[in-house]
Each structure stands twice: as structure tokens, then as C-alpha cells.
């Protein structure tokens, strides 16, 4: 199929899982499919389940990054048979199945551990709820692939530029950090209710809102795609009333979403389904 862009590099892929039931994310995701190149470009696509989610994740990768000449997989049935095999045949991508018991031949499998470590480090640093792990995975992969690395094959370029040949746009990444305090505008409120509300930024909102939109969690624990938001000013960070508001915000989120150490005691309903098309 010619509607997909092409990339001239072999891609490795592997699946990593969260702890079942206890740490199913707020969006219902239980695992991620990681795609990686020899230059260490990395991206991850969410999946509700491995069996049904892999063809959708593969389609999303082909649409957003491009079709490689070959895809190296670990030999799981859903990766080498059925819809995935049919899709790869249609787009002209060769599937290379690794021999069983050779995990180090798959670069993606090695890098999954590094990605998990970075996600855990960011969530621990910011004390963000463990239920938000999938948002953090996406934020980490975008940041890792959009900055320069000391790699002799990159020629001073970012990983994404090396992959696609296009300049890397970091406009929607550089301004807000993971789980950073923000004030966002919600215009559904009427006077005398305030238009600005306190929230936590969870990274770029793909497939929702506009290009600059960010996922923002409000005080009720709901995640919304927001375009109009800003960092807290210095006076807001030091004001005692604002400090108390942030403490109340965190206490409410911990009750609804859990902490960086433990998940919530009560079941949390699914909010947002991953969108691919």
C-alpha cells in the first residue's frame, strides 16, 4: 500500500506488560508494543490486550512513523500470523522471526528495561499515581526520540530526524514536564465561577484536540485534552492559599487514583480508549 510513508531502517519490536488487574491504566491499557531502530529511536503504542491489540499498534506505527523493509519479532502467534502477517504482506514489510531463547537479538527487548526504569524514575520523582503509567510511557518515548544523543550514527541529529529525514518539532514537548502543575482554561464555566483551574500535565494529547493540546488531569482525576494552559507563576508557587489548594488537589487524586507507591483501593472506570484511526 502506497498510502504509508517509508523508512529505510530495520525495526525491532517487543511487548511489555503492567501488573494485571491491579495496575491496568486509567485508559484500560495493560501493555505497550515498543518499536525500536538500530539508532535507538523508540516509540510505544498502547494495547488493551496483546492478542487483539498488536495489529492495531502495528497499523499505528506504519501510519505515524512509516513502513520499514523488515520487522524483527519474537515469534508470538499474533505477530507472525493472522492480521499482522496480512498487513505486512500488503505494505511490503518482511517479518523476521527470532529463534526461541535468543532475547538479546532483539534490540527492543533490551531497551524495554531502560524505558521501564525511566518511567519509574519520573513517576517516583513527581509522586504521580501508578495508574497513570501509560501516559508516562508515551511522554518518555516522545522525549527520548526528540532530543540529541551521543551516537556516532546520528551525525548530530535527533533520533526522529534520523528516522524520517524531517526536522523534529518539539513545540508541544519542551514547555511542560511530566506531571507538572499547570493552570488551564475551561470556558464552560459561567460568572462568577473562575475560568482557570488547577491541573497536572500528562504530556502531548495525540489524536485529541489540536497539535499543541496537552493531556491535563483535573482535581476530580479526569483527563482532558486542553490547548489553553500555562505554568504556575512564582507568586502562585509561594502563596500559602495556592499551596493549600495543591495539597488538597494531591489528596483528592491519591484517594481516586492512588499514589506512586500503591494503586487506589476502589475500582477506577476506563476514561479514554486509545485511538489509532
Where are these regions (language model features)?
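Retroviral integrase
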Residues: 1-115, 161-277
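Terminal low-complexity regulatory extensions
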Residues: 156-157
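Surface-exposed, charged/polar loop-rich segments
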Residues: 93, 97-153
Amino acid at each position: 500500500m502506497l498510502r504509508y510513508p517509508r523508512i529505510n531502517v530495520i525495526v525491532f519490536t517487543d511487548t511489555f506488560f503492567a501488573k494485571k488487574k491491579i495496575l491496568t491504566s486509567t485508559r484500560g491499557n495493560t501493555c505497550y508494543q515498543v518499536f525500536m531502530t538500530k539508532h535507538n529511536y523508540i516509540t510505544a503504542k498502547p494495547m488493551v490486550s496483546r492478542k487483539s491489540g498488536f495489529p492495531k499498534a502495528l497499523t499505528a506505527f506504519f501510519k505515524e512513523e512509516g513502513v520499514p523493509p523488515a520487522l524483527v519479532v519474537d515469534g508470538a502467534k499474533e505477530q507472525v500470523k493472522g492480521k499482522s502477517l496480512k498487513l505486512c504482506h500488503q505494505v511490503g514489510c518482511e517479518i523476521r522471526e527470532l529463534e526461541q531463547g535468543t532475547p538479546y537479538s532483539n534490540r527492543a527487548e533490551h531497551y524495554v528495561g531502560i524505558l521501564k526504569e525511566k518511567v519509574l524514575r519520573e513517576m517516583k520523582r513527581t509522586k504521580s499515581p501508578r495508574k497513570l503509567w501509560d501516559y508516562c510511557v508515551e511522554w518518555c518515548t516522545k522525549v527520548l526520540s526528540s532530543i540529541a544523543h551521543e551516537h556516532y550514527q546520528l551525525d548530530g541529529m535527533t533520533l526522529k530526524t534520523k528516522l524520517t529525514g524531517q526536522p523534529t518539532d518539539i513545540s508541544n514537548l519542551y514547555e511542560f514536564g511530566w506531571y507538572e502543575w499547570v493552570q488551564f482554561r475551561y470556558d464552560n464555566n459561567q460568572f462568577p465561577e473562575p475560568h482557570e483551574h488547577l491541573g497536572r500535565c500528562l504530556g502531548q494529547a495525540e489524536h485529541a484536540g489540536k497539535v499543541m493540546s496537552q493531556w491535563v488531569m483535573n482535581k476530580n482525576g479526569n483527563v482532558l485534552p486542553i490547548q489553553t494552559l500555562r505554568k504556575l507563576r512564582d507568586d502562585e508557587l509561594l502563596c500559602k492559599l495556592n499551596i493549600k489548594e495543591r495539597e488538597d488537589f494531591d489528596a483528592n487524586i491519591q484517594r481516586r487514583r492512588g499514589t506512586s507507591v500503591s494503586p487506589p483501593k476502589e475500582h477506577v472506570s476506563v476514561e479514554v480508549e486509545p485511538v489509532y484511526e
